[in-house]
Amino acid sequence: MARYLGPKCKLSRREGCDLLLKSGVRDHKSKCKSEKLPGQHGDKKPRLNSYGIQLREKQKIRRLYGILEKQFRNYYKKAARQKGSTGENLMALLERRLDNVVYRMGFASTRAEARQLVAHKAILVNDKVVNVPSFLVNPGDTVSVRQKAKNQGRIQAALALSEQRAPCDWITVDTGSFKGTFSTAPTLMDLSSDYNVNLVVELYSK
């Protein structure tokens, strides 16, 4: 699948916040020193109408999870077909992605690194190899690192970095055995308040 391979800081600057696209070895300000928007006229912040605000919010969430537009729209369509709040369903689907779960458990320092671990067959789901980053983890599923991958330096470093992040209530992790359990899909109350998924629903429902 195609992926964005350009500068990560450029995306964070565009959205005006840290999208967690780089490891947490250094803080966001030292990694992305410029706070201006990318481009020739980055020092001039444009005025956004309602559509522009909705679009920026969609781009922020899409880039946070490292998903291209077509796949993101498909997640929205699936969320809209499910019972309950479309916004909450959408975020639950994104959080259930295997690459995201691997990142949340601390086995990778970024979602991009988690995606690579999954693609390289370093991750097990219920003791079976799964190499599809978009695989949807179900409540009660266990996710672990394969035995031969446990000594990888990047996984050890990621686990150390993960101690600086706030724990996720919907995930339990045993770092000693490189294993975790996805207890339940999170609600909007569990997730960051840095984005408003309802704006995405408004954008796509037009």
Swiss-Prot record:
One of its GO terms (biological process) is ribosomal small subunit biogenesis. PROSITE patterns: RIBOSOMAL_S4 (PS00632), S4 (PS50889). One of its GO terms (cellular component) is small ribosomal subunit. Keywords: Ribonucleoprotein, Ribosomal protein, RNA-binding, rRNA-binding. The keyword Membrane does not apply. SMART domains: Ribosomal_S4 (SM01390), S4 (SM00363). Residues 96-161 form the S4 RNA-binding domain. InterPro entries: Ribosomal_uS4 (IPR022801), Ribosomal_uS4_bac-type (IPR005709), Ribosomal_uS4_CS (IPR018079), Ribosomal_uS4_N (IPR001912), S4_RNA-bd (IPR002942), S4_RNA-bd_sf (IPR036986). Part of the 30S ribosomal subunit. Contacts protein S5. The interaction surface between S4 and S5 is involved in control of translational fidelity. PANTHER family: 30S 40S RIBOSOMAL PROTEIN, SMALL RIBOSOMAL SUBUNIT PROTEIN US4M. One of the primary rRNA binding proteins, it binds directly to 16S rRNA where it nucleates assembly of the body of the 30S subunit. Belongs to the universal ribosomal protein uS4 family. HAMAP family: Ribosomal_uS4_B. This is Small ribosomal subunit protein uS4.
